[in-house]
């Protein structure tokens, strides 16, 4: 097996450009097959969003926590193919067995078959899975990114024990956050004394779980921009030992996420047509407008995913001749990611990409596009070919090992 450093096969920026269009083409083709209303399957937005979300979370377990075990010594592309197949099998097992049939025994809102039996909307079980994944996108990788794998490392644990220990630690925090931030929403939907109802109504102006989406998605973006285009800045300025460094980083990231979500709420009316808000309020009241604000804040955050991931992994944090680890490059890439996210947002909504390219028939009128665009689904789907290539295929065939 080649052991030299990876280098872009065609140099930069050509390797980055080629990989960008390849990932886009793969995502677009598979979207047409599985999600586009004009395609053969038409799973939009559910259950498509549930499967794609769980694919990413299971991928985090496989790559970030288990270190590709037990396939780490298999050559490419065989390793990537095997890990992709394993991912799909695990996704089915986690959803259909762990959630629907095990956890669903105690929590009926997680039980697809239980909801079906009592003639309740089965989509709520799929929403419950998506919400778990949303929480897990932060609580599982945060131990690696902000805590340097504390408390599992440093230790003499090797794989798979180390990975399973990290999964257990992440699951502990995921279940706590899920109980506090997600379960009350289902208490509002399925009212009764067993589950508390949404406690954040006064804070967010809505009982909907989209209040959580609105700021939690920004926390995920901040978390993952850290090891990518930020190259661990600004957290590298925090010099206290673990776990204090991780705790401080989490607090700052959450405060920053809340601030960005509130900022989005304030500025969204600057470009979203007033008719959009009128239609929402006429349909379900003022709280529906607030729900939209929080959801659209999360959707705005979603447009940052592809820019910072591809800039780091396939453009090698290119910084126009600047020191890639310097502060000037940090600000250059941050501004660049913001600009690319804004451009992608404009193409999706004003260029109506969601309608003509993705088949969302709710986007024919401008006033309907923002409330029904479901851009977060596309942006998470778009990153899967990139993540699979980086995580499972280790950038094959776009990168080669130096001799």
Locate each region found by the language model.
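N-terminal signal-anchor module of multipass membrane proteins
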Residues: 1-62, 132-134, 380
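Cytoplasmic membrane-interface regions of multi-pass membrane proteins
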Residues: 1-10, 58-82, 138-165, 191, ...
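Transmembrane alpha-helical segments of multi-pass membrane proteins
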Residues: 8-22, 75-93, 158-177, 242-260, ...
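Long, compositionally biased low-complexity segments enriched in polar/charged residues
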Residues: 14, 20-28, 55-58, 88, ...
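Generic alpha-helical transmembrane segments
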Residues: 47-62, 131-139, 214-227, 293-313, ...
């Amino acid at each position: 097996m080649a052991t030299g450093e990876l280098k872009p096969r065609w140099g930069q920026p050509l390797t980055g450009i080629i990989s960008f269009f390849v990932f886009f083409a793969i995502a677009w083709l598979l979207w047409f097959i599985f999600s586009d209303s004009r395609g053969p399957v038409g799973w939009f937005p559910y259950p498509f969003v549930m499967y794609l979300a769980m694919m990413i979370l299971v991928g985090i377990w496989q790559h970030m926590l288990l270190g590709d075990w037990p396939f780490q010594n298999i050559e490419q592309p065989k390793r990537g193919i095997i890990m992709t197949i394993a991912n799909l099998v695990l996704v089915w097992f986690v959803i259909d067995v762990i959630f629907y049939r095990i956890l669903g025994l105690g929590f009926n809102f997680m039980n697809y078959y239980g909801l079906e039996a009592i003639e309740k909307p089965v989509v709520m079980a799929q929403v419950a899975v998506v919400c778990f994944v949303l929480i897990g996108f932060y609580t599982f990788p945060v131990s690696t990114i902000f805590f340097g794998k504390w408390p599992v490392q440093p230790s003499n644990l090797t794989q798979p024990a180390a990975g399973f220990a990290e999964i257990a630690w992440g699951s502990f925090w995921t279940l706590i956050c899920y109980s506090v931030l997600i379960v009350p929403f289902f208490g509002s939907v399925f009212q009764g004394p067993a589950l508390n109802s949404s406690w954040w109504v006064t804070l967010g102006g809505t009982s909907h779980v989209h209040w959580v989406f609105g700021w939690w998605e920004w926390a995920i973006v901040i978390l993952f921009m850290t090891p990518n285009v930020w190259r661990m800045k600004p957290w590298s300025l925090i010099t206290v030992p673990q776990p204090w460094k991780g705790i401080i980083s989490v607090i700052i990231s959450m405060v920053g996420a809340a601030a960005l979500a509130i900022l989005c709420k304030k500025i969204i009316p600057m470009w979203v047509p007033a008719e959009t808000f009128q239609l929402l309020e006429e349909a379900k009241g003022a709280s529906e407008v607030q729900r939209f604000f929080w959801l659209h804040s999360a959707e705005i955050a979603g447009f940052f995913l592809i820019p910072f991931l591809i800039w780091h992994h396939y453009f090698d944090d290119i910084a126009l001749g600047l020191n890639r680890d310097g502060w000037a490059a940090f600000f250059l890439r941050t501004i660049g990611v913001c600009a690319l996210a804004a451009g992608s947002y404009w193409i999706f909504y004003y260029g109506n990409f969601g309608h003509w390219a993705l088949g969302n028939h709710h986007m024919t009128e401008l006033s309907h596009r923002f409330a029904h665009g479901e851009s977060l689904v596309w942006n998470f789907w778009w990153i899967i070919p990139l993540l699979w290539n980086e995580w499972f295929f280790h950038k094959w065939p776009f990168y080669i090992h130096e001799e």
